[in-house]
């Protein structure tokens, strides 16, 4: 398994729309495994393939307290949503930033699992929020897109400044 590099906002590659996975094979399973390892190492609860510059519809999530209940979603589709909720969301692609984002409280999705079998999942609370957040990544949408232009621009400038500092450290 490998740790993958997580792209950071405002990297344009985060805006690419992910393509459906056409065939479940060992390569896709390896990508999902590497994504899980990357997510755990970064102490995140979800990661979309877009965030690691792989533009396929793959999401990994683990919102369990013991961090031993990974969920792999291949080609997820939102079937139903209801209610309203929201929390202060963070994102591995926008480190150090959080914002309250409105989301559906309950959702039902359909996806393929690691073996390529189709399944339905009904989720609420944190799992529902996390799935919606990660599915946004698959269409090139970030949580900052829900914010006012002023707040989004402030975060973008902060991230660009951080990127320049990190580039100087790497030299």
Swiss-Prot record:
Cofactors, names only: Fe(2+)
Keyword Metal-binding: yes
Catalytic activities: N-terminal N-formyl-L-methionyl-[peptide] + H2O = N-terminal L-methionyl-[peptide] + formate
EC number(s) from the headed UniProt entry: 3.5.1.88
Gene Ontology process terms (BP): co-translational protein modification; translation
Keywords: Hydrolase, Iron, Metal-binding, Protein biosynthesis
Alphabetical list of Gene3D superfamilies matching this protein: Peptide deformylase
Entry coiled-coil feature ranges: none
InterPro entries according to UniProt: Peptide_deformylase (IPR023635), Peptide_deformylase_sf (IPR036821)
Cofactor binding: number and manner: Binds 1 Fe(2+) ion.
Residues annotated as binding Fe cation: 91, 133, 137
Disulfide feature: none
GO-annotated molecular function: metal ion binding; peptide deformylase activity
CDD domains: Pep_deformylase
Family statement drawn from the similarity comment of this UniProt entry: Belongs to the polypeptide deformylase family.
HAMAP family: Pep_deformylase
The protein's name in its UniProt record: Peptide deformylase
Organism: Hamiltonella defensa subsp. Acyrthosiphon pisum (strain 5AT)
Lineage, opening ranks: Bacteria, Pseudomonadati, Pseudomonadota, Gammaproteobacteria, Enterobacterales
